[in-house]
Design a protein with these regions (language model features):
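Short, basic/low-complexity N-terminal boundary segments at the transition from targeting/disordered tails
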Residues: 1-20, 129-140
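Conserved beta-strand hairpin/beta-sheet module of binuclear metal-dependent hydrolase folds
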Residues: 16-64, 178-192
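Hydrophobic/aromatic beta-strand patches that form the interior of the parallel beta-sheet core
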Residues: 27, 74, 104, 149, ...
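Short catalytic-loop micro-motif centered on adjacent basic/acidic residues
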Residues: 45-48, 72-75, 166
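Active-site metal-binding motif and surrounding structural segment of the metallo-beta-lactamase
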Residues: 53-105, 150
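Short, solvent-exposed loop/turn and secondary-structure capping segments
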Residues: 85-86, 114-117, 190
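Metallo-beta-lactamase
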Residues: 111-168
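Acidic/His-rich structured neighborhood in mature extracellular/periplasmic domains
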Residues: 144-147, 159-163, 172-174, 181-184, ...
């Protein structure tokens, strides 16, 4: 297990408040972008996977409250602070002998990742200026873990007795998704 420090200034993207327990197996890790975790009894759903630098922090905080396998990782949208901490979660699953989590996103997200890769030098330059990231430290993600499943309007997942409703809507991006967990009365909304 190694922590990825490849994206930006650690001070800028530091912990914004730690893990919050909302009861009923619902947790939120407050980082640069919030990460929602729902313990469904038979496994965990992670909504938004954070920055590359957040991955092992997500795993550490999750493992402090649950040893269950992560069954789904939902990308709220394709920005760097929402979809790039995935690698650590996948490595944790492999190390524990758990099945690989299924990654779910809106159908526009793969096109966003493709565009990011084509325009990487430009995004590097913009982020370097916007976030004061010094030369020699990557300022934009290089590793892309694409979703296994995509959807257009709505998608419903079941995990144990828990329903995970995913809905697309225009938010900050055209690939924006929000999640509703009716049995828990919880909405995870990414950057809406």
């Amino acid at each position: 297990m190694s922590e990825d420090t490849s994206l930006g200034s650690q001070a800028l993207f530091s912990d914004a408040g730690g893990m919050k327990d909302f009861g009923s197996g619902v947790y939120m890790l407050q980082l640069f972008a919030n990460v929602c975790m729902v313990d469904c009894g038979e496994g965990v759903v992670i909504f938004d996977a954070g920055l590359p630098t957040d991955g092992w922090r997500i795993v550490k905080e999750l493992r402090a409250v649950s040893d269950l396998p992560v069954r789904y990782i939902i990308y709220g949208h394709g920005h760097a602070d929402h979809a790039f901490g995935t690698k650590a979660v996948l490595e944790d699953a492999a190390e524990r002998g758990h099945p690989r989590p299924v990654i779910v996103a809106h159908e526009n997200l793969p096109k966003r990742f493709d565009r990011y890769q084509r325009m990487l030098p430009y995004h590097e330059r913009i982020n370097r200026i916007q976030f004061a990231i010094p030369e020699g430290i990557p300022a934009f993600p290089w590793d892309y873990i694409y979703p296994d499943e995509t959807f257009s309007g709505e998608m419903t997942l079941r995990l144990g007795d828990i329903t995970i409703e995913l809905r697309h809507a225009r938010g900050e991006t055209d690939d924006h998704v929000w999640m509703w967990v009716p049995e828990r009365g919880v909405a995870c909304v990414s950057d809406f």
